[in-house]
Amino acid sequence: AELVIIPRHLFSTPSLLLDYICYRKVTVLIWAASALGLLAVLKGLEYKVPTEIKKIFFSGEVMPVKLLRIWQCALPGTEFVNLYGPTEITCNCTYYPVERVYEDGEKLPIGMPFEGRKVFLLDENMQIVTEPEKKGEICVAGESLALGYYRNREETDKHFKIWQAGEKSFRYYRTGDLGYRGADGNLYFAGRKDFQIKHMGHRIELEEIEARIEQVEGVRKCCCILDRRKNRLKAFY
């Protein structure tokens, strides 16, 4: 197969981007979720459907299921795979083949670890989380783990740790992402630790509020913040 690097300037014009993908007869697409979402929001697939595509891998951020549905409807025979992983694990560590159409309000799993990668959850007491549905910080290890940050010992020591279990030990990376294991055994992304706030005595995930608002018809994307001056939550869409 031939590797096709799509010119960056085409991403600003959906029609030209789709023309190029169709002209080059792209069969496997490896994209950021935001790029797929942009084409869906701008109704690019109503202009042209790249029917040669057999597989689409997406990562980088949470893919809204209502935008993924647009792609699934346009390409019903195409395989979609949700990838997850920080740059520090070079570059993805889990995968989830999307085998059905998800409805609004459902969460898309980030799946299971690739071979050679280890993914586990740690609670606030640095204990491994094993209970289903209980959140913890996603930590990753494996053969592709980075050595650290170039010429930045402080950040390296902060995020790259050693797990000691008896006589065995291994290096791992604390992603700062929250996750949990579902009853189906899959891993689910649950936002960033630094996006978790305490408001009126309640621990709140801003990304969960954003996800709920994005289910409202007509809302494409939402951003939620805490206004500390007025002690109020504010949402922008």
Regions found by a protein language model. Give the residues of each.
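Motif- and composition-driven signal specific to adenylation
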Residues: 1-128, 132, 137-146, 172, ...
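AMP-dependent adenylate-forming
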Residues: 37, 79-82, 97-237
